[in-house]
Amino acid sequence: LDDDAFVVPVGGVGAPTVSLELLPSVDEASKVLDLYEKLVGRPIAAVASFEIGGGNSLMPLMAAAVRGLPVVDGDGMGRAFPEAQMMSYAIAGVKPTPALAMDYAGNTAVFETSDTTTYEHHIRAFAAAAGGMITVAEHPMSGAQIKASVVPATVSFSLKLGRLLREQRGPIDDVLPELRTLFADSVYGSVHKIFAGKVSSKNSRT
Protein backbone atom coordinates (compact mmCIF):
# COMPACT_ATOMS: atom_id res chain seq x y z
CA LEU A 1 0.00 0.00 0.00
CA ASP A 2 1.52 3.31 -1.09
CA ASP A 3 2.06 5.90 1.63
CA ASP A 4 -0.07 8.42 -0.27
CA ALA A 5 -2.94 5.98 -0.96
CA PHE A 6 -6.38 7.14 0.18
CA VAL A 7 -7.77 4.60 2.67
CA VAL A 8 -11.28 4.73 4.17
CA PRO A 9 -12.66 2.45 6.90
CA VAL A 10 -16.30 1.48 6.40
CA GLY A 11 -18.76 -0.36 8.63
CA GLY A 12 -21.91 -0.27 10.68
CA VAL A 13 -22.79 1.81 13.73
CA GLY A 14 -25.66 0.93 16.04
CA ALA A 15 -27.23 -2.11 17.65
CA PRO A 16 -26.32 -5.44 16.00
CA THR A 17 -29.66 -6.98 17.00
CA VAL A 18 -31.45 -4.28 14.97
CA SER A 19 -29.65 -5.46 11.83
CA LEU A 20 -31.51 -8.75 12.16
CA GLU A 21 -34.68 -6.80 11.36
CA LEU A 22 -33.20 -4.05 9.15
CA LEU A 23 -31.12 -6.40 7.01
CA PRO A 24 -28.35 -4.58 5.11
CA SER A 25 -28.17 -5.05 1.35
CA VAL A 26 -25.07 -6.52 -0.27
CA ASP A 27 -24.14 -3.18 -1.83
CA GLU A 28 -25.05 -0.88 1.07
CA ALA A 29 -21.45 -0.29 2.16
CA SER A 30 -20.28 0.17 -1.43
CA LYS A 31 -23.00 2.81 -1.96
CA VAL A 32 -21.66 4.68 1.06
CA LEU A 33 -18.19 4.58 -0.50
CA ASP A 34 -19.59 5.94 -3.78
CA LEU A 35 -21.19 8.85 -1.93
CA TYR A 36 -18.04 9.40 0.11
CA GLU A 37 -15.88 9.72 -3.00
CA LYS A 38 -18.28 12.36 -4.34
CA LEU A 39 -18.12 14.17 -1.01
CA VAL A 40 -14.34 14.38 -0.80
CA GLY A 41 -13.63 14.44 -4.55
CA ARG A 42 -11.02 11.71 -4.36
CA PRO A 43 -11.01 8.02 -5.37
CA ILE A 44 -10.63 5.45 -2.61
CA ALA A 45 -7.61 3.16 -3.04
CA ALA A 46 -8.40 0.67 -0.25
CA VAL A 47 -10.91 0.02 2.52
CA ALA A 48 -10.35 -0.99 6.13
CA SER A 49 -12.30 -2.29 9.11
CA PHE A 50 -13.34 -0.42 12.26
CA GLU A 51 -13.17 -3.60 14.30
CA ILE A 52 -12.48 -7.25 13.60
CA GLY A 53 -15.17 -8.41 16.04
CA GLY A 54 -18.73 -8.93 14.84
CA GLY A 55 -20.34 -7.86 11.58
CA ASN A 56 -17.93 -4.99 11.01
CA SER A 57 -15.28 -7.53 10.07
CA LEU A 58 -17.37 -8.41 7.01
CA MET A 59 -18.70 -5.05 5.80
CA PRO A 60 -15.38 -3.85 4.32
CA LEU A 61 -15.04 -7.21 2.54
CA MET A 62 -18.52 -6.83 1.04
CA ALA A 63 -17.80 -3.27 -0.08
CA ALA A 64 -14.44 -4.27 -1.52
CA ALA A 65 -15.96 -7.18 -3.43
CA VAL A 66 -18.58 -4.93 -5.05
CA ARG A 67 -16.11 -2.12 -5.80
CA GLY A 68 -13.09 -4.27 -6.70
CA LEU A 69 -10.93 -2.65 -4.01
CA PRO A 70 -8.22 -4.15 -1.78
CA VAL A 71 -8.87 -4.57 1.94
CA VAL A 72 -6.26 -3.63 4.54
CA ASP A 73 -5.23 -6.70 6.55
CA GLY A 74 -5.93 -5.19 9.95
CA ASP A 75 -8.45 -3.12 11.88
CA GLY A 76 -8.78 -0.36 14.45
CA MET A 77 -9.27 -2.44 17.58
CA GLY A 78 -8.21 -6.08 17.34
CA ARG A 79 -11.62 -7.07 18.73
CA ALA A 80 -15.08 -5.51 19.06
CA PHE A 81 -15.34 -2.03 20.60
CA PRO A 82 -18.10 0.17 22.01
CA GLU A 83 -17.03 3.70 20.94
CA ALA A 84 -15.09 5.38 18.12
CA GLN A 85 -12.52 7.14 20.31
CA MET A 86 -11.30 3.70 21.43
CA MET A 87 -10.05 2.78 17.96
CA SER A 88 -6.31 2.71 17.31
CA TYR A 89 -6.91 5.15 14.44
CA ALA A 90 -8.24 7.76 16.88
CA ILE A 91 -5.53 7.04 19.44
CA ALA A 92 -2.92 7.62 16.72
CA GLY A 93 -4.45 11.04 16.03
CA VAL A 94 -6.38 10.30 12.83
CA LYS A 95 -9.27 12.74 12.44
CA PRO A 96 -12.67 10.96 12.33
CA THR A 97 -14.16 13.19 9.66
CA PRO A 98 -15.31 13.99 7.08
CA ALA A 99 -17.64 11.08 7.74
CA LEU A 100 -20.72 10.04 5.79
CA ALA A 101 -23.54 7.93 7.23
CA MET A 102 -26.49 6.31 5.48
CA ASP A 103 -29.55 4.63 6.97
CA TYR A 104 -31.55 1.69 5.59
CA ALA A 105 -33.81 4.06 3.63
CA GLY A 106 -30.91 5.81 1.88
CA ASN A 107 -31.02 8.99 3.98
CA THR A 108 -27.54 10.41 4.52
CA ALA A 109 -25.76 12.72 6.92
CA VAL A 110 -22.28 14.26 6.78
CA PHE A 111 -20.21 14.93 9.90
CA GLU A 112 -17.30 17.32 10.36
CA THR A 113 -15.40 17.57 13.65
CA SER A 114 -11.82 17.03 14.75
CA ASP A 115 -12.81 15.56 18.12
CA THR A 116 -13.57 11.84 18.06
CA THR A 117 -15.59 11.82 21.29
CA THR A 118 -17.86 14.55 19.91
CA TYR A 119 -18.14 12.61 16.67
CA GLU A 120 -19.10 9.47 18.61
CA HIS A 121 -21.96 11.29 20.34
CA HIS A 122 -23.27 12.72 17.07
CA ILE A 123 -23.01 9.52 15.03
CA ARG A 124 -24.80 7.54 17.76
CA ALA A 125 -27.60 10.09 17.83
CA PHE A 126 -28.06 9.73 14.08
CA ALA A 127 -28.05 5.93 14.40
CA ALA A 128 -30.77 6.10 17.06
CA ALA A 129 -32.86 8.48 14.94
CA ALA A 130 -32.41 6.22 11.91
CA GLY A 131 -33.88 3.16 13.58
CA GLY A 132 -30.83 1.84 15.38
CA MET A 133 -28.40 0.92 12.57
CA ILE A 134 -26.48 2.90 9.94
CA THR A 135 -23.57 2.35 7.54
CA VAL A 136 -20.65 4.77 7.85
CA ALA A 137 -17.43 5.75 6.08
CA GLU A 138 -15.11 7.58 8.48
CA HIS A 139 -11.52 8.15 9.66
CA PRO A 140 -10.10 8.77 6.16
CA MET A 141 -6.33 8.44 6.11
CA SER A 142 -3.26 7.97 3.99
CA GLY A 143 -1.45 4.70 3.49
CA ALA A 144 1.28 5.96 5.80
CA GLN A 145 -1.26 6.79 8.51
CA ILE A 146 -2.95 3.41 8.44
CA LYS A 147 0.39 1.60 8.54
CA ALA A 148 1.20 3.53 11.70
CA SER A 149 -2.19 3.09 13.38
CA VAL A 150 -3.73 -0.24 12.34
CA VAL A 151 -3.79 -3.38 14.48
CA PRO A 152 -2.02 -5.55 11.88
CA ALA A 153 -2.92 -8.88 10.27
CA THR A 154 -6.24 -9.37 12.08
CA VAL A 155 -8.23 -10.16 8.92
CA SER A 156 -5.89 -12.94 7.82
CA PHE A 157 -5.68 -14.19 11.41
CA SER A 158 -9.48 -14.41 11.63
CA LEU A 159 -9.58 -16.46 8.45
CA LYS A 160 -6.94 -18.84 9.81
CA LEU A 161 -8.71 -19.13 13.16
CA GLY A 162 -12.08 -19.80 11.55
CA ARG A 163 -10.58 -22.42 9.26
CA LEU A 164 -8.86 -24.13 12.19
CA LEU A 165 -12.03 -24.27 14.31
CA ARG A 166 -14.09 -25.51 11.37
CA GLU A 167 -11.67 -28.31 10.55
CA GLN A 168 -10.57 -29.30 14.06
CA ARG A 169 -13.75 -30.52 15.72
CA GLY A 170 -13.67 -32.31 19.05
CA PRO A 171 -12.54 -31.72 22.65
CA ILE A 172 -10.80 -28.40 23.31
CA ASP A 173 -7.68 -30.17 24.55
CA ASP A 174 -7.24 -31.68 21.09
CA VAL A 175 -7.39 -28.24 19.47
CA LEU A 176 -5.24 -26.34 21.99
CA PRO A 177 -1.83 -27.20 20.49
CA GLU A 178 -2.78 -25.77 17.09
CA LEU A 179 -4.47 -22.78 18.71
CA ARG A 180 -1.30 -22.02 20.67
CA THR A 181 0.78 -22.20 17.51
CA LEU A 182 -1.60 -19.90 15.63
CA PHE A 183 -1.85 -17.31 18.42
CA ALA A 184 1.90 -17.30 19.07
CA ASP A 185 2.45 -15.78 15.62
CA SER A 186 -0.23 -13.10 16.06
CA VAL A 187 -0.72 -9.75 17.83
CA TYR A 188 -2.83 -11.53 20.45
CA GLY A 189 -0.08 -13.46 22.20
CA SER A 190 -0.32 -16.80 23.97
CA VAL A 191 -3.42 -18.91 24.62
CA HIS A 192 -4.37 -20.14 28.10
CA LYS A 193 -7.18 -22.54 28.96
CA ILE A 194 -9.17 -21.07 31.87
CA PHE A 195 -12.13 -23.44 31.85
CA ALA A 196 -14.11 -25.67 29.49
CA GLY A 197 -17.88 -25.47 29.14
CA LYS A 198 -20.82 -25.28 26.79
CA VAL A 199 -23.15 -22.36 26.04
CA SER A 200 -26.67 -23.56 26.74
CA SER A 201 -28.57 -20.29 26.27
CA LYS A 202 -28.12 -16.55 25.70
CA ASN A 203 -30.13 -13.40 26.30
CA SER A 204 -29.48 -10.39 24.04
CA ARG A 205 -31.05 -7.04 24.93
CA THR A 206 -30.81 -3.81 22.93
Segments from the language model and where they lie:
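Short glycine/serine/threonine-rich phosphate/pyrophosphate-binding segments
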Residues: 29-30, 49-61, 78-83
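Alpha-helix C-terminal capping segments
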Residues: 39, 59-70
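Glycine-rich oxoanion-binding loops at beta->alpha junctions
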Residues: 3-45
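Conserved anion/nucleotide-ligand pocket segment
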Residues: 105-155
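Oxyanion-binding "anion nests"
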Residues: 163-206
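Short, acidic/small-residue loops that bind anionic groups at enzyme active sites
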Residues: 66-85
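A short, small-residue-rich loop immediately preceding and capping a beta-strand
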Residues: 43-56, 70-72
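A structural-propensity feature for long, helix-poor, extended segments
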Residues: 4-13, 86-126
